[in-house]
Design a protein with these regions (language model features):
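P-loop NTPase catalytic core
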Residues: 175, 182-186, 191-422
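Phosphate-interacting basic helix/loop segments used at nucleotide- and nucleic-acid interfaces
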Residues: 49-53, 158-162, 248-253, 302
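Basic helix-extension-helix modules of the SAP/HeH family
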Residues: 1-47
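Short acidic, glycine/proline-enriched loop segments that cap or flank alpha-helices
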Residues: 5-6, 25-28, 108-112, 369-373
Length: 422
């Protein structure tokens, strides 16, 4: 039996499941969910002698660790599984490793509270004895993105078609979506995520929502069911925002070390930076907007982890940055991150107010070394379009309106580019 299946059940479903193992309903009604799960696992262990569990490792300062559950957003929970320092040292396990193994229920007479890992079966889908071969993420060679992530997947999804031409995203891209309030940022992130899931099922996609509203989290999970949506809502403490983001990053790094392509969509880098500003010890130096001088170090490490790896694999991070919120802190955070990315997509509030969606500022949006991602025809046509726009003095409103109309009349970008000739 797999413990993760139990974790997904509601309390009522657990009650029905418990009856199959002789746990009486009148008894189970008086116990908590964790105790009920432990009773089921003990009964299963007594009958079959083997219980399988899976989780993502978080190592602690004392040397031991716990397997955290995706269902609890990798935060501390009653379903966590203890893993001993000896096992961590023996296999060279790291935070973020996805571990599958045999576990046993806690011993009441020893005062144990958590399930314990008995035997490791796989680490990141591979045999644990092969772990000594894997490299460290920081030792891998970063290069410019040279393989485009094609976001075009439906004729009516105009935003992803425009991104494909104006600011293409490659494997290993470090991209910023610069967005004022109510400019269509969330819808755009959902379309980007759906395009990746549709066109690249082999890419592991994480959507990390920090300091978001709970209903936004539910909507994201329903709109992008194929992605792993991890969230720390605004009613959580800042240290939990930081813990969740670090766990997602470490899990992504472990996958990249195994030569997988990983994408993290972060909403938003601004709120993550705000959380670190409250968590880091005060340095005594306060910058513009109340930002501590040490606060942005870890958010920059998060964003800077995005890279295309020469040895194989890539980590792509697309993060939203909030501007024009009326907060000097938000503006300062954007200014600090502005030069660190190699792709920027700007959304315009004026276009959104005119109900022009996607409200993309084509003139301000671009990708560094886009020649490595675009075809020769795409590159020449887009350069000609930008040059024509500047020479004719065409304003942004008129340009995006024309582009949207032309794209609505064509089925794909290849047909749109042919239309530009006329």
């Amino acid at each position: 039996m797999h413990i993760s299946k139990l974790s997904c059940l509601t309390f009522e479903e657990l009650l029905e499941f418990a009856e199959g193992y002789g746990i009486k309903k009148d008894t189970s009604n008086n116990i908590r969910r964790q105790e009920l799960m432990q009773a089921i696992v003990r009964a299963q262990h007594a009958m079959e002698g083997k219980i399988i569990a899976e989780g993502t490792l978080e190592t602690l300062q004392d040397g031991f660790g716990f397997l955290r559950s995706q269902n609890s957003n990798y935060l501390v929970g009653p379903d966590d599984i203890y893993i001993s320092p000896a096992q961590i040292r023996l296999f060279g396990l790291r935070t973020g490793d996805i571990i599958t193994g045999e576990v046993r229920p806690p011993k009441d007479n020893a005062g144990e509270k958590f399930f314990a890992l008995l035997k490791i079966l796989t680490v990141n889908g591979e045999e644990p004895n092969n772990l000594y071969k894997r490299p460290h993420f920081d030792k891998l060679t970063p290069i410019f993105p040279n393989e485009r992530i094609d976001l075009e997947f439906a004729p009516n999804k105009i935003s992803t078609r425009i991104i494909n031409l104006v600011s293409p995203i490659g494997k290993g891209q470090r991209g910023l979506i610069v967005a004022p309030p109510k400019a269509g940022k969330t819808m755009m992130l959902q379309e980007i995520a759906n395009a990746i899931c549709r066109n690249y099922p082999d890419i592991k996609l994480f959507i990390l929502l920090i300091d978001e509203r709970p209903e936004e989290v539910t909507d994201m999970k329903r709109q992008v069911p194929e992605a792993e949506v991890i969230a720390s809502t605004f009613d959580e403490t800042p240290d939990k925002h930081c813990q969740v983001s670090e766990m997602v990053l470490e899990k992504a790094k472990r996958l990249v070390e195994n030569k997988h392509d990983v994408v993290i969509i972060l909403d938003s880098i601004t709120r993550l930076s705000r959380a670190y500003n409250l968590v880091v010890p005060a340095s005594g130096k306060v910058l513009t907007g109340g930002v501590d001088s040490n606060a942005l170090h870890k958010p920059k490490r998060f964003f800077g982890a995005a890279r295309n790896i020469e040895e194989g694999g890539s980590l792509t991070i697309i993060a939203s940055a909030l501007v024009d919120t009326g907060s000097k802190m938000d503006d300062y955070i954007y200014e600090e991150f502005k030069g660190t990315g190699n792709m920027e997509l700007h959304l315009d509030r004026k276009l959104a107010n005119r109900r022009l969606f996607p409200a993309i500022d084509i003139d301000s949006s671009s990708t560094r070394r886009e020649d490595l991602l675009l075809t020769e025809e795409e590159k020449n046509k887009m350069w000609a379009l930008r040059k024509y726009m500047q020479s004719q003095g065409i304003d942004e409103d008129q340009l995006i309106e024309t582009v949207i109309d032309k794209m609505n009349s064509t089925k794909d970008n290849a047909e749109f580019l042919k239309l530009l000739n006329s």
